[in-house]
Amino acid sequence: MYSLSDFDFELPQELIAQTPLAERSASRLLHVAQDGMIDRAFADIVDLLNPGDLLVFNDTRVLKARFFGVKETGGKVEVLVERVIDSAHVHAQIRASKSPVPGMKIRLADAFDVIVGERAGEFYELQFPGDIFALIEAHGRLPLPPYIEHAADAYDETRYQTVYAKTPGAVAAPTAGLHFDQALLDTLKAKGVQFAYVTLHVGAGTFQPVRNENLAEHNMHSEWYTISQETVGAVHAAQAAGHNIVAVGTTSMRALESASQSGSLQAGSADTRLFITPGYTFKTVTRLITNFHLPKSTLLMLVSAFAGYDAIRAAYQHAISQRYRFFSYGDAMFLTRMPPC
């Protein structure tokens, strides 16, 4: 039985990637194989996949979800849109010296006013005055992760999105997908590797460390996903032919496994609080492409459940010793599902 301290590790600060490499696919890839570890280039992913294998990408698009504003009382606030609820309302985190109250107006980006609604846990409901996505795109700022020390610029607005991002709604990028450029996608397709897409809107909770030593006490954050019947058909066809289902990132993994709780993948949309820890039985995914994750994070627990705790522990020690780049703008791993006990 694992506890929180089992997922802690010391990471030299200089290994936290602050900027992306000049070329998306120029990053490194640590291949954690059954018989050891192999240092590769990310472009080698072509050699690790066979014709008929199915890559499942998360096509969410990161919103410019961060705003700075002023309450009608004059106090400064910072707003992070967590989720778009409908055409007029969002859930958002608000940082202010004094908590806003329902009915209060907040001027955002010196451009438009939102009205504060009821508070639900750590989020406030905010009413926007018009097209939410248009206002966010025009006036918001890209919300880079807290460990990236520079303010988002125009370069980040391109590079903190996947090249196939389509469905706006995330406040963090599905970072394993950042390594794929169009040339690499074309090479994979020419080899006969198949593509499918899910949408899971990554929330700010993805960066939150677990705080309970007893993992069973952790309150997992909620994220919304949708999986089409077309994707379900592609997964079932690949499985029937004996091919691998390769999740591009933990967010694709979370969507696929959340929709497979009946035993096989089902189409639909839902909120998921699925918390994957060692001992979980994977139902759909057989391979995983993922970046290196934060200490004590739910994502580190997920990859440990998938590839094996000891294998991941050794892989992270190897990555640190070999100076891999960590976190969102960092390098990647290619993992094989651990055989069931």
Swiss-Prot record:
It is found in: Cytoplasm. The keyword Metal-binding does not apply. One of its GO terms (cellular component) is cytoplasm. It catalyses: 7-aminomethyl-7-carbaguanosine(34) in tRNA + S-adenosyl-L-methionine = epoxyqueuosine(34) in tRNA + adenine + L-methionine + 2 H(+). Pathway: tRNA modification; tRNA-queuosine biosynthesis. It is an enzyme of class 2 (transferase). Its EC number is 2.4.99.17. GO terms for molecular function: S-adenosylmethionine:tRNA ribosyltransferase-isomerase activity. Keywords: Cytoplasm, Queuosine biosynthesis, S-adenosyl-L-methionine, Transferase. One of its GO terms (biological process) is tRNA wobble guanine modification. Monomer. Belongs to the QueA family. Transfers and isomerizes the ribose moiety from AdoMet to the 7-aminomethyl group of 7-deazaguanine (preQ1-tRNA) to give epoxyqueuosine (oQ-tRNA). This is S-adenosylmethionine:tRNA ribosyltransferase-isomerase.
